Swiss-Prot record:
Its EC number is 2.7.7.90. The keyword Nucleotide-binding does not apply. Keywords: Cytoplasm, Lipopolysaccharide biosynthesis, Nucleotidyltransferase, Transferase. It is an enzyme of class 2 (transferase). The keyword Cytoplasm applies. Activates KDO8N (a required 8-carbon sugar) for incorporation into bacterial lipopolysaccharide in the Shewanella genus. It is found in: Cytoplasm. One of its GO terms (cellular component) is cytosol. InterPro entries: Cytidylyl_trans (IPR003329), KdsB (IPR004528), Nucleotide-diphossugar_trans (IPR029044). GO terms for molecular function: 3-deoxy-manno-octulosonate cytidylyltransferase activity. This is 8-amino-3,8-dideoxy-manno-octulosonate cytidylyltransferase.
Amino acid sequence: MNVTLLIPARYGSSRFPGKPLAPINGKPMIQHVYERAALAKGLKDIYVATDDERIKNAVEGFGGKVVMTGADAASGTDRIDDAITQLGLADDDLVINLQGDQPLIDPISIEQLVSLCERHPGEFDMATLGVEIRDEAQINDPNHVKMVFDNNFNALYFSRATIPFGRESSDYPVYKHLGIYAYTRKFIQTFAKLPLGRLEDLEKLEQLRALEYGYKIKVAISAFDSPEVDTPEDIRICEARLAVD
C-alpha cells in the first residue's frame, strides 16, 4: 500500500493570519510539522498542499515538496482532493491528512494510524486518532475537539462541547481528537462531493460530514498528545514543550 502524507496549509485565518509561517524556535510552524512527519516510517511521499506563494516559498526553502491547489477550497479535505488529483494517486492509495497546525505531532502517532489502515483494509471509510485529556482546562475549551466512540472504536460523534456529559459523576475519561486523518484516494473524492452536513456546519467540524452521511470512522487512541496552534498564545506553549522534548 502506497502512503502519501499531505499537509493542507492556508495563509488566511481570522484568529491567526499567517499561522503556517509563524516562527517557533526559529523555524516556521509548517517546517516543524513537515520534519516531524518525515520521521515517521512507511511514508512514500510528503507534500504541503497550499494556494499561497509565501507558504510555497517557505516549504521549498527548507527542502520540502509542495502541491499548489486552487484558492477556492472550502475545507482542508477539499484542498487534499485537489492535491491528490494533481498527484495522480491510485484509488486504493492511502492518504494521510495531517493538519498544518500540529507542530508537535509524534511520528509514532502517524505510524500508528498507517498501521491501523494496513491491518484492516476496507473495514472502514476513514481513520483518525484521539488522546485522553489530562489537562482539565481542555475539557471545556471549544478549541479542543472532543470525541466519543463505541466499544469497537468506531466514532459516534465529535464536538466542541464536552462529551460525554456525566450527569452524576465526572470520574470518566474524556478524549480529544487529534488533527490527522487517513483514507483512500477513492473515498476522499466521494467525500468531497457530499453536500455540507448540518452538524458539520453547526460545529465547524468537517469529519461530521462523514458521520452524517453514514460513513464509518475508525478511532485509535494515541499515547501522545499533539497540541494544536489556534492562537499566537499557543506558540509559547509549543516552544516550552520543544525546549524539553
